UniProtKB/Swiss-Prot annotation:
Name used for this protein in its record: Small ribosomal subunit protein uS13
Span list, region Disordered: 95-124
Alphabetized UniProt keyword annotations: Ribonucleoprotein, Ribosomal protein, RNA-binding, rRNA-binding, tRNA-binding
Record GO cellular component, one term: cytosol
PROSITE patterns with a match to the protein in the record: RIBOSOMAL_S13_1, RIBOSOMAL_S13_2
Homology family: Belongs to the universal ribosomal protein uS13 family.
Keyword tRNA-binding among record annotations: yes
GO molecular function: rRNA binding; structural constituent of ribosome; tRNA binding
């Protein structure tokens, strides 16, 4: 396995796909990186030369925030929103969807398992 940005990327996959294993690098950034470093996306990671690996590593670390730095920045942004009490921060604190999704039905991923509430009792 080759290491880029502190991540072991799979040797058997095409470079274009393997780069997406790095947090913060999706298909668009992977293609942009390959275009800038003039490496074919069709080549497998195991077939990359050392110079190509170094150029990929330098380009990614020089131009993008990836892995730990990006995770820290996202966490800090969320923490800041919670501290200032913005609408988004309140939604984060309550564990509800932040981006305006409906919650009357659905939103189970954020809300957790359904908590059943007892219905109305019958009068005797």
């Amino acid at each position: 396995m080759a290491r880029l940005a502190g991540v072991d990327i799979p040797r058997e996959k095409r470079v274009e796909v393997a780069l997406t294993y790095i947090y913060g690098v999706g298909r668009t950034r992977a293609l942009q990186t390959l275009r800038e470093t003039e490496i074919s996306g069709e080549i497998r990671v195991k077939d990359l030369t050392d110079e190509q690996l170094v150029s990929l590593r330098d380009y990614i670390e020089g131009n993008f925030k990836v892995e730990g730095d990006l995770r820290r920045e996202v966490a800090a942004d969320i923490r800041r929103k919670v501290e200032i009490g913005s609408y988004e921060g309140i939604r984060h604190r309550k564990g509800l969807p932040v981006r305006g999704q409906r919650t009357k039905t659905n939103a189970r991923t954020r809300k957790g398992p359904k908590r059943t509430v007892a219905g109305k009792k019958k009068a005797r």
